[in-house]
Amino acid sequence: SIGVDGRLDVNYEILTDVAIPQIPIVGMTIKTVPELKELHWLGLGPYDAYPNKKAASILGVWGGEAGSADVTGMKATRWIERSNSECGFRIMSNGYMKHDASHPEIMHILSYVFGRPEKGRQADESVPQMRTDTGVPFVGGFSILLNADLQKK
């Protein structure tokens, strides 16, 4: 839904119909214009963060140029900003962001992330397993604020 202040709230449910027992990620993909070169986030960084691997990451505001080694990978987030000197937007999302150097204009806003295997072992049962055979949909959401709204916050 779009509020009178221009805030876009996105909510989704995904009910899987696949032949695999688990899925690696659940979320949505956002493609931006190439001119929005800066990417910043409040969350864990600068290293990758997964539900079962957060020890090397530190809570803070992180960022750099989209597609650079400073911002690529899997990041646990509270908000994400794409901008340049003239305009931008903020995504409010209590989840994860995946960003790849090969497609700097694309961000994956994720509500669920499968625990990362370590040394050949799968994540233990304390990490959400994201099973596809339960009949329960994956639910997520986020909000987008335009640059003008950021200056008021």
Regions found by a protein language model. Give the residues of each.
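Beta-strand/loop-rich accessory regions of lumenal/periplasmic or secreted enzymes
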Residues: S1-K153
